[in-house]
């Protein structure tokens, strides 16, 4: 899979932009603040349904405009698609494929990309919510149906929290507790599906992560992903490397465990007016050489871990997708690497059908990734060099 053309209207600092892409490596060069990251952010949005920089879509609409449009022409072998999303200030977003309307959450069915940016260091050093979003975005790319599951879980969670607060205020009336049981059943069904999907994903990422870390760092530091589930009260720490492939069974039947966990915290939840266990509060422990990467890994090791996670994601998508490789996006990555690691990364990504790279300094990028270079100046596309 690759992008052949990108059109932007009122997206970030671009009033309009038309960009042609080649197969293989495409390098965007420009000083900081010129708009090169905005270009790749727009493509990342099409597959992740969100920005890697901001939580609100509104920030991506150009100041003074009411809507922004991202339109990309996608090619897979002989098949060509026109994929479009419209971001609206005062209404729901809209999406199209070949001019036919679709739900925005269906976009990952048609375009797949993996983006790595400096902000991804937060995967290792940031809060649990960052790691949950990483897993869920990858889940949706692998199976877009899960977008609806996640959205429905969040809706049910919100309703349940509202009911818990109401029950607390009315001193736990019997009729409200009965209604809570109904919401519990829905929360259990959706939550167990999401937990199991995350566990399966972590298991599948295990081997690609080890290989990717070695390819970008040259070290055998054995990175691992260990689930920390609030419904279990503990996380798996089995020293057997193969145990990651059987994470789900380590917790027993997820729905039953979740049900028992909810029962165990029922009165605490009523006192606090908050759902205390479930996938919305889970975390993933990133481990390097048997130690938590957060707090123990150096800056370079943390950077390598985050980059390896994204490369492992790309490898997993390329193995499973019938549409070929995801488009690999490396946003301002090479500036953080020494020359040896730049060479290693260039070798690692060389086999992908298309790689999009941004850099402030042309010389930071190995020559084999700079054959098709586009310069960006003040939100304007300069002819390829």
From Swiss-Prot:
UniProt cross-references to Pfam families, sorted A to Z: SMC_N
PROSITE patterns referenced in this protein's UniProt entry, alphabetically: RECF_1 (PS00617), RECF_2 (PS00618)
Main location (coarse class): cytoplasm
Example GO BP: SOS response
Keywords: ATP-binding, Cytoplasm, DNA damage, DNA repair, DNA replication, DNA-binding, Nucleotide-binding, SOS response
Molecular function terms from GO: ATP binding; single-stranded DNA binding
SUPFAM superfamilies (alphabetical): P-loop containing nucleoside triphosphate hydrolases
Location within or outside the cell: Cytoplasm
Binding site for ATP: 30-37
Cellular component GO terms, alphabetical: cytoplasm
Known function: The RecF protein is involved in DNA metabolism; it is required for DNA replication and normal SOS inducibility. RecF binds preferentially to single-stranded, linear DNA. It also seems to bind ATP.
Record family assignment: Belongs to the RecF family.
Protein's name according to its UniProt entry: DNA replication and repair protein RecF
């Amino acid at each position: 899979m690759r992008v052949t053309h990108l059109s932007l209207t009122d997206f970030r600092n671009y009033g309009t932009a038309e960009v042609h892409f080649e197969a293989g490596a495409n390098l965007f060069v420009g000083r900081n603040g010129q708009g090169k990251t905005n270009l790749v952010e727009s493509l990342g949005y099409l597959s992740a349904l969100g920005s890697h920089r901001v939580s609100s879509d509104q920030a991506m609409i150009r100041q003074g405009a009411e809507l922004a449009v991202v339109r990309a022409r996608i090619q897979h072998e002989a098949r060509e698609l026109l994929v479009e999303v419209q971001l609206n200030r005062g209404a729901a977003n809209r999406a199209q494929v070949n001019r036919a309307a679709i739900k925005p959450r269906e976009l990952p069915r048609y375009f797949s990309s993996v983006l790595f940016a400096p902000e991804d260091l937060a995967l290792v050093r940031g809060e649990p919510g960052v790691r949950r979003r990483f897993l869920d975005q990858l889940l949706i790319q692998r199976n877009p149906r899960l977008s609806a599951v996640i959205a429905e879980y969040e809706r049910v969670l919100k309703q349940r929290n509202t009911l818990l607060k109401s029950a607390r205020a009315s001193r736990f009336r019997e009729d409200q507790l009965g209604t809570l049981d109904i919401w519990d059943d829905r929360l259990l069904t959706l939550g167990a599906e999401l937990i199991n999907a995350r566990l399966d994903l972590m298991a599948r990422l295990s081997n690609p992560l080890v290989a990717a870390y070695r390819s970008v760092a040259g070290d055998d530091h054995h990175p691992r992903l260990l689930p920390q589930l609030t419904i279990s009260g503990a996380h798996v720490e089995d020293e057997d490397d193969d145990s990651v492939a059987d994470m789900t069974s380590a917790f027993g039947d997820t729905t039953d465990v979740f049900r028992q966990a909810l029962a165990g915290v029922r009165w605490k939840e009523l006192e606090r007016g908050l759902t205390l266990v479930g996938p919305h509060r889970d975390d993933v422990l990133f481990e390097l050489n048997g130690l938590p990467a957060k707090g123990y890994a150096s800056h370079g090791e943390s950077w390598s871990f985050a980059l390896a996670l994204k490369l492992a994601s790309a490898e997993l998508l390329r193995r499973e997708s019938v549409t070929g490789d995801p488009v690999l996006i490396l946003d301002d990555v090479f500036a953080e690497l020494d020359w040896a690691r730049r060479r290693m990364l260039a070798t690692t990504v060389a086999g992908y059908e298309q790689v999009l790279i941004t850099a402030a300094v042309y010389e930071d990028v190995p020559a084999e990734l700079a054959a098709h270079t586009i310069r960006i100046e003040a939100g304007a596309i300069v002819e390829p060099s």
